[in-house]
Amino acid sequence: QMVKSVYETKKRFDFIDMNFIGSIQARNDKIAGKLFDIYMTEYQRLNPKWSREELKPFVDKLVKEHIDKIKPASNTMAQSVFVEHPTDGLSLAASYVGGISINENYGSDYKSFTEIKENEVRIGHKPVGCGNVKATIDHELGHQIANKLNACNDTEIVEKYNRFSGLSDIEQANTLSTYAAKNIGEFVAECWSEYSNNPQCRNVAAFVSKRLIDLYEAEEIGPKILERGFSR
């Protein structure tokens, strides 16, 4: 399902650059390796008389402090990483593993993962048609698309989100999902997830997703989209 999700999205948005697809834990290991190289180089520059072995404990400690900050929470099932302009060591290291990741604590048990997502759909926490692994990946890809297009600052999408966030929980569930009200980034990602998985996609998800397509076509940052809407 992960391959299917990425393939369909790449077919629509060719600019999506997936440097990493895998578990959050494996991604963090790669970030740790990059961080070590970055900070070791800097420490050696600042302390030319110190050997690599002498500096290693200090670098290891700094790397651990950074990695501890990005460990997935117990309820985190998936994450998206997108760093276009690194501003520090951590974001520079993360820029090498831009893409999507699944928490291996959930991804290692497909049946349990699916049951959790189906229940989230049932209670309105997630959109209709999104009770599966593919929809979770599509949600994370929605973040990638939105970040690349700066969609969260688009006037039409902001207006749609502001109206949505003013709805009651029940109205939000019937319109899209309650999770979509968390912030505009999650709102856009939830819209893309439903658009990619619900053959009877509802109005808000359809509007926002088609707006993403319009923004992409206007940017001319890649081949034009050949198809719209739900596809199997």
Predicted regions and their residues:
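Active-site-flanking segments in enzyme catalytic domains
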Residues: Q1-S231
